[in-house]
Design a protein with these regions (language model features):
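Conserved H-D interstitial segment of serine endopeptidase catalytic domains
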Residues: 45-46, 61-64, 83-88, 110-113, ...
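Extracellular trypsin-like serine protease catalytic domains
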Residues: 9-11, 16-19, 82-95, 191-200, ...
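Sequence contexts marking disulfide-bonded cysteines in secreted/extracellular proteins
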Residues: 1, 25-31, 38-44, 53-59, ...
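Extracellular/periplasmic catalytic domains that process cell-envelope and extracellular macromolecules
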Residues: 29-34, 71-76, 96, 104, ...
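Active-site substrate-binding loop(s) of clan PA
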Residues: 148-154, 169-215
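Short, structured beta-strand segments at or near domain termini in extracellular proteins/domains
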Residues: 35-41, 163-166, 300-310
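Solvent-exposed loop/turn segments at secondary-structure junctions
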Residues: 116-118, 134, 154-156, 169-173, ...
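Protease-domain processing segments flanking chymotrypsin-fold serine proteases, especially trypsin-like
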Residues: 1-111, 126
């Protein structure tokens, strides 16, 4: 159905139970597991917002690693997740190593950085949602079903550094522990944002098992380009419109190694809701940690169409 219409899929048998007026709102077939399904909209008027954004609003109830960051409060970022790789230890036993962050944006889908899947010969096998302590024995890991890189991403470049991870199990409901973030779709003014991750708390330091957060300020791409020379392999065109930069003017706080794939977020209040968290960027690249050089993030609003089409198609 059109991008901002809500609807359902019906089997041919279910379609016959609809009234004539309801059938008028149906068009297009798809095949799922060899079963033909018919797409029908619920109403004739489009939603006020795009489907991906409206579904996020519907899911919310009305009314930490980062250089020099602070530990996030329990359940403060229920949309935060970690991607886990299966590794074999020297003694032959297997365990899970969490190496990249991700953000839950739907019942089965998460956003992360595409470059995360090139750190080793293997792909991640599980997702740990909810911003849990990575050493927790009570947290639940969810098996990964599919990884979808942006079709224009080319490693080791920094352009189009975005991917969607789909898990096998569907979250039937959101809770205060595990919930989704909304996907930002508008231009972003220069403002304060929050970076979240499990990376190193200082350059060349050890990673943190606790979720960390830090406040940064977005800057213009023009200012950001003053800190980065064009690199034929990584930044051949400099910092472009599909990227976002953020820094700490005190040169203390920053995203660091291990934060890759984690979100850059802003929070806004809208009518009827106490607070909505939006992912505006994905941690992609930086020079050192806490050096004063801005970090580079994938600008989410530039990929809204691709995210929506990938999830709902």
């Amino acid at each position: 159905s059109p991008k901002n219409f809500k609807g359902y899929y019906y089997t041919p048998e279910g379609f016959q139970t609809l009234t004539d007026s309801q059938k008028n709102n149906c068009e297009g077939n798809c095949v799922d597991n060899n079963v033909t399904l018919i797409c029908c909209t619920i109403n004739t008027r489009p939603q006020k917002y795009r489907l991906l954004y409206q579904s996020c609003i519907d899911a919310h109830l009305p009314y930490g690693l980062v250089t020099f960051g602070v530990v996030a409060k329990p359940n403060e970022f229920p949309f935060m997740a970690a991607l886990g790789w299966r590794i074999t230890k020297e003694d032959g036993t297997e365990s899970i190593a969490y190496r990249c962050g991700a953000t839950l944006i739907g019942r089965r889908h998460l956003l992360t950085a595409a470059h995360c899947f090139y750190h080793s010969s293997d792909l991640p096998v599980v997702v740990r949602p909810g911003g849990f302590d990575l050493n927790s024995t009570t947290a639940i890991d969810y098996d990964i079903d599919q990884i979808i890189e942006h079709p224009n991403y080319i490693y080791p470049g920094l352009y189009n550094d975005i991917a969607i991870v789909r898990i096998v199990k569907v979250f039937l409901s959101y809770t205060s522990i595990v919930a989704r973030a909304c996907v930002w779709y508008k231009p972003l003014a220069e403002q304060e944002v929050t970076a979240i991750g499990y990376g190193n708390t200082q350059f060349a330091g050890t990673s943190s098992p606790l979720l960390m957060k830090t406040s940064l300020s977005t800057i213009s791409n023009e200012e950001c380009n003053q800190h980065y020379e064009q690199d034929d392999e990584v930044l051949s065109s400099g910092v472009v419109s599909t990227q976002l930069c953020a820094k700490d003017y005190e040169k203390l706080r920053d995203t660091c190694q291990g934060d890759s794939g984690g979100p850059l977020i802003v929070c806004e209040k809208i009518d009827g809701y106490s607070r909505m968290a939006y992912i505006v960027g994905i941690t992609s690249f930086g020079i050192g940690c806490g050096t004063g050089t801005p970090g580079i993030y994938t600008r989410i609003s530039e990929y809204f169409d691709w995210i929506e089409e990938t999830i709902y198609n």
